[in-house]
């Protein structure tokens, strides 16, 4: 004879999943949504336009709002936004001069 308690019975909703399985599924859906780099780029672009933030400020705010560590930005932020942050930093002299020399792109200013 098998013994069991009422705690062993899992409550099930209409989808057939327990509460724990539902919470895991919801968490996976949220992570999948955050991994959509293109959508994240649109959100950051919208923040820049609406609030007049720089790309660096908007990206930092996005990462903080979604509890994403700054070290993992490459998984969540599209390369186009990263390039815009780099160009902003160079234009606004936010980088050391030695770094700017390495990152400076070729221009046709000498033709002017």
From Swiss-Prot:
Q: Where, by residue number, does the polypeptide cross the bilayer?
A: none
Q: Name one GO molecular function term.
A: transcription regulator activator activity
Q: Which Gene3D superfamilies match?
A: Phage late-transcription coactivator-like (1.10.10.2850)
GO terms classed as biological process: late viral transcription
| Region spans: Interaction with host RNAP | 62-92
Q: Where is this region: Involved in transcriptional enhancement?
A: 106-112
Check the record and name the Pfam families matching this protein: Trans_coact
The record, for InterPro entries, names:
LTACT_myovirus (IPR046384), Trans_coact (IPR031836), Trans_coact_sf (IPR042071)
Q: Which domain of life is it from?
A: Viruses
Q: Its function?
A: Activates transcription at late promoters when the sliding clamp is present. Binds to both the host RNA polymerase (RNAP) and the upstream dsDNA.
Subunit note: Interacts with the beta subunit of host RNAP RpoB (via flap domain). Part of the transcription activation complex containing host RNAP, the viral RNA polymerase sigma-like factor, the coactivator gp33, and the sliding clamp.
Q: In which family does this protein belong, per the annotation?
A: Belongs to the Tevenvirinae late transcription coactivator family.
Q: What is known of its domains?
A: The C-terminus is involved in transcriptional enhancement.
* UniProt xrefs under HAMAP family: T4_TRANSCR_COACT
- Protein name per UniProt: Late transcription coactivator
Gene coding for it: 33
